[in-house]
């Protein structure tokens, strides 16, 4: 309210203005890019980046798919998602970690390929920090796990849980080590809820 009225409460108004400015600046940069240009840039980065671990951050779920019929996740863009996954598999890109949220629950999972034992993409979901009473928390039964994420002539992409689903307010703390990424889920007070080590491909 203070920010809307233009009054100052500590640094809150400056922080809110900064977030708004950054949002507008990035929106202006992205608005002139077509979807194809953005996808090409992502694929080029995945192929050419020398980083040993590549964090792909997206505001909506990449996988697993939610059982609801919403259109605000990658589930609504299966062809584009498949092109990205096929790029990772065909170029044998290791240690791609998708970081996302927006499902009112937190979890980790791994995507494998039925005909390629070396293929692996992991996801870390961290959501929500403060949920509304109007929005139910996600649970394991909220997601589609009994069928492949995608089926192609070369094989199926299928999911595996690598953690339980955290169905309460929380945030994730990540530590990247040589052999694994440690994911710690903590409650709003910073108290430990659950942790898991996600192995990295060496």
Regions found by a protein language model. Give the residues of each.
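Long, structured stretches of catalytic cores involved in phosphate-ester chemistry, encompassing
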Residues: 1-202
């Amino acid at each position: 309210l203070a920010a809307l009225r233009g009054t100052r409460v500590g640094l809150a108004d400056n922080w809110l203005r900064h977030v708004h400015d950054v949002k507008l600046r990035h929106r202006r940069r992205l608005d002139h890019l077509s979807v194809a240009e953005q996808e090409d840039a992502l694929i080029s980065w995945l192929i050419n980046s020398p980083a040993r671990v590549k964090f792909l951050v997206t505001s909506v779920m990449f996988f697993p798919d939610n059982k609801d019929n919403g259109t605000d996740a990658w589930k609504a863009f299966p062809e584009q998602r498949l092109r990205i996954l096929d790029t990772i598999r065909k170029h044998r890109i290791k240690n791609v970690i998708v970081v996302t949220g927006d499902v009112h629950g937190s979890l980790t999972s791994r995507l494998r390929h039925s005909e390629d034992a070396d293929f692996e993409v992991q996801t870390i979901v961290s959501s929500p920090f403060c949920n509304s009473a109007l929005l139910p928390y996600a649970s394991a039964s909220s997601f589609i796990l009994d069928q492949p994420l995608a089926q192609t002539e070369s094989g199926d992409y299928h999911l595996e849980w690598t953690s339980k689903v955290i169905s309460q307010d929380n945030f994730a703390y990540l530590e990247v080590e040589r052999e694994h990424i440690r994911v710690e889920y903590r409650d709003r007070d910073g108290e430990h809820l659950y942790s898991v080590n996600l192995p990295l491909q060496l």
